[in-house]
Amino acid sequence: MPEEKIRLTQLSHGGGCGCKIAPAVLQKILAGTTGSIIPPQLLVGTETSDDAAVYQINAQQAIVATTDFFMPIVDNPRDFGRIAATNAISDVYAMGGTPLFALALVGMPVNVLPLETIGQILQGGEDVCRAAGIPIAGGHTIDSVEPIYGLVAIGLVNPEHLKRNSGAKSGDKLILGKQLGVGIYSAALKKDQLQAKDYEAMVETTTQLNTPGPVLACLDGVHAVTDVTGFGLAGHLLEVCKGSGLRATVNYQDLPVLPKAREFMQAGLMTGASGRNWASYGEGVRIADGLEGIAQTLLTDPQTSGGLLVSCSPETVTEVLSLFLQHGFPHVSVIGEMAEGEPGIDVI
C-alpha cells in the first residue's frame, strides 16, 4: 500500500461495519426501552431486524428509509467515502427499493484532519450517489473525536414487491452476491499486510452497488432478501432463519471468498468484531467437525458493504444467477438451502 500522509484507520478504534455494537449487547440495550408506536402504515419496523424501515403511503408506493455510518475501514479518504455511501444505499436495494435521495452524516476531528481530506471523504460519497442516480440533498455535521461518515438513504418500493428478510420458504436455495472476507482484509490493512492488488479487490467489492435488488424484488420465486454486513454471513442468515422459522444449511466450500482471505485467516488476521459476533449468536450455528476454527472466522467476519443474500425457489436459481451476472457480479454463488427445523444454521 502506498503511504498516506494521514492514516484514517489509525484515528479510530474500529472500522467499517465492524464498528457495530455486538448483537447481544444491542439486545440488552433495547430491552430497557419501551418500544415505539407501530402505525398500520409501517410495513417493516424493528420486529425482524430487517435492513430498512418501510412506510406505506398508498397502494402502489411505500417509502424505504435507512441509515448507516461508521469509522474508516481504509486510509484513502475518497475510498472511505465511497465505501460508506455504497454500504448505506445497499439497504434500500435489499428491500427491493429504488433509491431516491440521501442525507450525509458527518462527524470529523476538524482539528486533526485537514479540511481537504474531509472534503475528499464527502466527495467519495457524492461519487457513489451520482452513480446511483440520486442527490445528497442535505445532512448534518459534528466535530467528533474519530472520523465518522455515512448516509441516510431514502427509497421507494411497490409494497407488492417488498422483500423482507423473513419470507424464506422450506426448500429455498440460498444465493450470495459478493465474496466474503472484507473484515479480514481490513485487519490485514491495519497490520500493513495488504498488497496493492488486494486493496484494489477490497475497494472494488465494497464500492459495488447492489443494483440487482429492485429487479430481484419483481421475481415471484424470490422469497427473502437481505444484505450481509457487520454481523457477518452467519448473523444475517440467522435473522432470516428466525424471521422465517426455518433452518439453513450452508456448504462451506461453496462460499465465495476474497482471494487472500483464507491465507490471512490462517495467519490469525481477523477483526475483534468477529469474536463479538460469535459470542452473540454462536449457539445458533453448528459447524461440522474439522471446519470449526476457520469456518467460524469467515462466517462471523463483518462485511462492510457486503453482498445480497437471496432465498429463492430452486426453479428461480438460474434466473437469479443470470441477473447477478448481468449486473456485474461474477462471484455470485449458491451457498446452501433452507429447510424445516429449529431456526439456526448447519455448516457442512
Swiss-Prot record:
Homodimer. Synthesizes selenophosphate from selenide and ATP. It comes from Dechloromonas aromatica (strain RCB). One of its GO terms (biological process) is selenocysteine biosynthetic process. NCBIfam families: PRK00943.1, selD. Its cofactor is Mg(2+). It catalyses: hydrogenselenide + ATP + H2O = selenophosphate + AMP + phosphate + 2 H(+). The gene is selD. GO terms for cellular component: cytoplasm. ATP binds at K20, T48, S49, D50, D68, D91, G139, H140, T141. Belongs to the selenophosphate synthase 1 family. Class I subfamily. It is an enzyme of class 2 (transferase). Mg(2+) binds at D51, D91, D227. This is Selenide, water dikinase. The record marks K20 as: Important for catalytic activity.
